[in-house]
Amino acid sequence: MNKGFTFKQFHINIGLCGMPVSTDGVLLGAWANIEQSKNILDIGCGTGLLSLMSAQRNENSHVDAVELMPLAAEVALQNFVQSPWKNRLHLIHQDILHYHPAHLYDAIICNPPYFNNGEQSQKGERSIARHTDSLPFDKLLKCCKALMSSKGRASFILPFIEGNQFIEIAKKHSFHLTKLTKIQTTEKKDVSRLLIELSIFPYIYQETTLIIHSKDGYSNDFIQLTRHFYLNMA
């Protein structure tokens, strides 16, 4: 049985839902602009990684984590209760398409599904979480627009091709691309992932590149971004 993953200030139990901790999730959780946000929404929280990272990074925040899958929701709740921030983390077992809170959010974080139905080969909650049939980009963006405050920011991570498709769909929903970080595993590799920030408000656009591995191990940029979370980072 998978025992999960231990970070510097919290532990992620995987349980039976089969959703392992990924580098994608850690990158997004460390990168998202949530430091000044009072109300944060984690869409499709899985085991709760992004919510826990947000709570650690912003001690004044309240995080609502919405998860449809029963096993994942159960595990996320367990992870929240065992964390130092259990009073600021709220698990909502519900379909985000039917979620109607009383307030809007300053920040939204989401590690979206990105495989289409033709690529689906696995079964179970992990498979559902990774396929766009469960939450198509268009519907996800409509939800974000409805749930986000006028100056709020929504942050995502996607593979390069799907990320560019996502950005084009977002423009049709009147979103501005306000921040983009291109991820390369090494300097010689092509861009593999995109960290994407969207907002209805036209913030000044920022674009950067992050290379994960250098010749001697992890790059300094990657270490600086993730050092407050990974146990082996100084």
Swiss-Prot record:
GO terms for biological process: methylation; tRNA processing. Pfam families: MTS. One of its GO terms (molecular function) is nucleic acid binding. HAMAP family: tRNA_methyltr_YfiC. It is found in: Cytoplasm. GO terms for cellular component: cytoplasm. Belongs to the methyltransferase superfamily. tRNA (adenine-N(6)-)-methyltransferase family. It comes from the Bacteria. This is tRNA1(Val) (adenine(37)-N6)-methyltransferase. Gene3D superfamilies: Vaccinia Virus protein VP39. Its EC number is 2.1.1.223. It is an enzyme of class 2 (transferase). It catalyses: adenosine(37) in tRNA1(Val) + S-adenosyl-L-methionine = N(6)-methyladenosine(37) in tRNA1(Val) + S-adenosyl-L-homocysteine + H(+). Specifically methylates the adenine in position 37 of tRNA(1)(Val) (anticodon cmo5UAC). Keywords: Cytoplasm, Methyltransferase, S-adenosyl-L-methionine, Transferase, tRNA processing.
